[in-house]
UniProtKB/Swiss-Prot annotation:
The chain crosses the membrane at residues 5-25. This is Cytochrome b6-f complex subunit 5. The 4 large subunits of the cytochrome b6-f complex are cytochrome b6, subunit IV (17 kDa polypeptide, PetD), cytochrome f and the Rieske protein, while the 4 small subunits are PetG, PetL, PetM and PetN. The complex functions as a dimer. Its main location: plastid. SUPFAM superfamilies: PetG subunit of the cytochrome b6f complex. Component of the cytochrome b6-f complex, which mediates electron transfer between photosystem II (PSII) and photosystem I (PSI), cyclic electron flow around PSI, and state transitions. PetG is required for either the stability or assembly of the cytochrome b6-f complex. InterPro entries: Cyt_6/f_cplx_su5, Cyt_6/f_cplx_su5_sf. GO terms for cellular component: chloroplast thylakoid membrane; cytochrome b6f complex. It is a single-pass membrane protein.
Amino acid sequence: MVEPLLSGIVLGLVPVTIAGLFVTAYLQYRRGDQATW
């Protein structure tokens, strides 16, 4: 079955995605740029 592989990919990608968002927001905060949201 593919489910163990799929769940492993999801469990691996979710923390990386969240960490990436935090790092991006932190770097933008450090540079003092106005976020274009």
